[in-house]
Regions:
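The identity of the second residue at the extreme N-terminus of proteins
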Residues: 1-2, 16
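Acidic, low-complexity, intrinsically disordered interaction modules
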Residues: 14-15, 26-91
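Short, low-complexity, charged amphipathic interaction modules
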Residues: 90-103
Length: 105
């Protein structure tokens, strides 16, 4: 799974905010406008084995990974900020477990 810098080639690119397949899936599951500015993203610094899942206004969950950058666990809090997730959002995200995380351009 490739992480794409939210602010590629802009002065904010060092903020380490990225879009990926998981954030796109969360946007769809929550019913967010795909062309809107309010979207899910992850923070990535590769230091602690965890990518916080965020949306403007708060941190909603995390993507955990091992030393090989393989996703081992994903969890989203369904009662904080975004209230439009389906009841089985966490189950639907399990399809990403086992994928390798890579930084894209």
């Amino acid at each position: 799974m490739k992480l794409i810098n939210k602010y590629a080639n802009l002065r904010y690119s060092k903020m380490n905010e990225y879009y990926c397949e998981i954030t796109t899936e969360l946007d769809k599951l929550a019913g967010l406008d795909p062309n809107g500015r309010w979207k899910h993203y992850v923070l990535c610094d590769y230091e602690d084995g965890c990518l916080p899942i965020r949306i403007p206004g708060g941190t909603l969950g995390s993507v955990e990974y091992d030393e090989n950058k393989i996703i081992t666990k994903i969890h989203v809090c369904t009662d904080y900020v975004v209230k439009t997730y389906p009841d089985d959002v966490n189950e639907q995200l399990q399809k990403f477990i086992g994928q390798k995380i890579e930084i894209g351009e």
